[in-house]
Amino acid sequence: MKKRIGKRTIRLNNMPTIVAASSIVGPKEGQGPLKDKFDLVISDDLYGEKTWELAESKMVQTALEMSVKKVNKNLEDVDFLFAGDLINQLFPASFAARELGIPFFGIYGACSTMTEGMCLGSMAIDGEYAEYVLCGASSHYCTAERQFRFPLELGNQKPMTAQWTVTGAGSVLLTKEGEGPKIKYIIPGKVIDKGIDDGNNMGAAMAPAAIDTIYSYFDDTKDDPDSFDLIATGDLGKVGKQIVIELLQEKNLDISKVYTDCGLEIFNLEEQDVHCGGSGCGCSATVFASYIYEKLIKKEFNKVMLVSTGALLSPTSTLQKQTIPSVAHGVVIVNE
């Protein structure tokens, strides 16, 4: 069967099964509406380590190990690890990989990293290059603030369009056989830049990339949005979500009945001071590996599209007054 459908969508003939998923979050996330869904809520942001970066590395390592243990496998059984984060040189993911001893592909897609890894891992299994693949992503409020914004000690105020970086790590274990939801389609994202240069308005910067990926899937497959139980973007927040709904409607595509954003699911915007919602690699990673995956396992959801969204700015690009390019990778997951 032909694997490429239209210009962007790839159908996986040997659909990888997501046999396990694991999530770890920080204290603030553990006070949100999904608090009972996570595998572990850590009691403080340092997680017993000396630095926030080491804490983040420990979180993603633990989440990856959890997924392997859940199906009674060993790390030696895993063929590839695709993982990444927001920090320079992928410090958290690389140092976790150092401890795991699995062939490691370090990936950077900003906050799109989770579905980027799932796309690549799925192709590895579909192409019969691997039997077991781990995918993971993490972020940490304190590490991201220090790298991309300001030292926490300054106490800078943020506009209401800003979002709160999730402290969390999520992982999934993919395999060519087994029981569980399967990845049927992947939609690799293009880099889109509509000229937004405000680092405190990431939702507006990333929404065009999500729109491009979601629209490409429906244009390629002629699928019906109402056939989905859920379409979830990664971390567009309140502002970005509304942009996606309105601009897709202008293209005669209405996903509003089944659409949510992981950045709105992980926090209670009325009770927690997170402004526009959650963000970070860990946002879509933890929401998928907890709430969404549980719904798929229980077959309360049978068809889900996850589109993690990433803003590809850097401290250097910001200082050089560049606009913010963004990317969004999509996966369609089904129970069949």
Feature locations, PLM:
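Conserved beta-ketoacyl condensing-enzyme motif
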Residues: 18, 52-109, 227-242
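Short, well-ordered amphipathic alpha-helical segments that serve as non-catalytic structural scaffolds
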Residues: 56-72, 120, 205-220, 287-292
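Short, well-ordered, mixed-charge alpha-helical segments that flank or form enzyme active sites
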Residues: 90-91, 141-146, 191-195, 313-315
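Short glycine/threonine-rich loop-to-helix capping motif typified by GTGT followed
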Residues: 94-97, 236-251, 316-323
